[in-house]
Amino acid sequence: MLYTTLLLAATAFSGADWPTFRGNAARTGASKADLAFPLTEEWVHSGSGRPQNAWPGPARHDLYNKVVNLTPRLWFDRAFYVSIADGRLFFGSSADEQIHCLDAETGEELWSYYTEAPVRFAPTVVGGKVIAGSDDGVVYCLRASNGELIWKERIAPDDQRLPGNGRMISLWPVRTGVVVSNGVAYVTAGLFPSEGSYVAALKVSSGDTVWKNNYKDMAPQGYLLASKDHLFVPASRSTPYVFDRRDGKRLRQLGGNSGTFAIVANDDLVFGPGKTGDMTEASGSGAQIASFKGQHMIVTRGTSYIHTTTELSALKREEFVSLTKERGELNKRRGELTSSLPNLSGADKSKAERELKRSAERLGEIEVAIRECILWRRVCDEPLDVILAGDALIAGGEDYIAAYAAKDGAKLWTAPVDGRAYGLAADDGKLYVSTDSGAIHCFGNPSEEEDSK
């Protein structure tokens, strides 16, 4: 695995609940919820149909650019991704156009709410409210207890429809989900750049607009992310955009690999995986910090976990950051010295040559030390998703899931599921798995749960 100047900033764990996609507004996929292995399947929900994807998978090869085995980049609706809060599980359905609520303990459906088009993204739950967007161009806010409508807001100014994926959808569908922070819900609407796309901030309490801006050159698709100051907007097969959360001003488009997987580490964004399976890390200011092989990443305060199509690995962050920073500075200095050599002579030239020799030796030492930053590396045949639950990494595969010890990568447990396990979530000692068959599996440890009562 090739790592190139990878700065991994610390990101806090989510709390006990999993109230939004990948647990929080940074989409870290990390939870404090401990799982007591071996887990037992407690229930399966499969009554909402099979996910109806907005886009087919990629062609196998890009012969023009000589790229084979293309990696999917638009993966946001391959399963019914779930949110969990206060003992209830919520998901949107692209099959039946509803927002569903299940009892997280039993899998019993408690209520559902019809929209007018597919709901492709997991809802966000905050303060007893469930907020979700639909392909009908509307953001819905429902009461978590009973599904009662509190407010709804159409983001675009008009209600125009057209056929899309065999359904009638808005000319401005909500294809980024909703991210909530400090009482404000951020959302986008739009898919066709020529028709304009809207980026908006709404008050969670009322749905009133805080700000709304229109852009004619972007196609927002993929889960929104938020840091302290910035809103990050994935842009389909293009690279993400950065917005100021205060007023919605678009600050820049990031360079690097495209794709709709992304996480925030402090104010850096890691995104990809690009069509070659490469990810990019960029700062909120736009500086590209890293490029590396990977499908998914989890960042914690001490260790970062990299998930590729074939491997799972752990990396010592602080040492790695220090070494890669030094390496970057040395390479920059070597470039300056090399450029200046033709213009030097005598003692100045000898001094520059000695510095180049010393820096080359130090770079060799740094490369060895960087390799030693890798705490462990394990073969992983489950490439579809990964989360961190307490001290275990859970990986999704085809028709099964697997758990690995975060401390050393040892395999702890496996279990079969119905379909490809694209969506994972953990809360209150339970693991929830969403697959491309439309199934949602719940795993728990009944003996541990009984002891805790």
Mark where each language-model region is.
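Sec-dependent N-terminal signal peptides
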Residues: 2-11
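Noncatalytic, solvent-exposed loop/strand surfaces
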Residues: 12-453
